[in-house]
Amino acid sequence: GPPMTYEDDDLDDAAAIDAAAEPPREPLYLSVYDFVDDWLLPNYQRKPGPFRWDPNWFDNFEAVERLTALWYAFEAARHDAAPAMAAFWLNTLDPMMRELSSQEGVFWYVRLYGEAGSATSPEPFKSNRAPDAIRTA
C-alpha cells in the first residue's frame, strides 16, 4: 500500500492530546536565588579548607549562569523517575560544584572559605585570530 503520511491536522491533534495528558510542571523554586538558599546550600555541604565559595555569588556572572543551569537540571530531574535525581547528583551537581568551588574555579578570588570576595574576573583567555584559509574550510 501507499506510505503512511501525517497531515498537519493529525500532528496538531497529537500535540493537543499530549498537552492535555500532562499538566504543566510547576517549579519547586521560583528563582535561582531561592534554589541556592533553600535547597543547594543546605543539601551540599563540604568541610572548609580547599574549597572556595563567595557568599555574594550572585555578583559573579559565571556563577549565576552555572547555578541557573544547575537549578534547571534539578527542576527537570525532580519530575522524572527516581533514578533521575541520582543521575542529577552524580552527573550534574557534583561536577558543577567542583568547578564552582575548586581553588582554580569560579570563586578563585576568595581567600578563605565563605569570605566575600571581590567578584572581579581574570583576564579572559586570549585567542589569536585563526587564518582565514582555515576559518572558511
Can you name each region flagged by the protein language model?
Residues 1-23, 126-137:
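Non-catalytic accessory regions used for complex assembly or targeting
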Residues 8-53:
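Short terminal alpha-helical segments
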Residues 23, 27, 31, 58-68, ...:
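Alpha-helix boundary/N-cap detector
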Residues 82-137:
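Amphipathic alpha-helical binding modules
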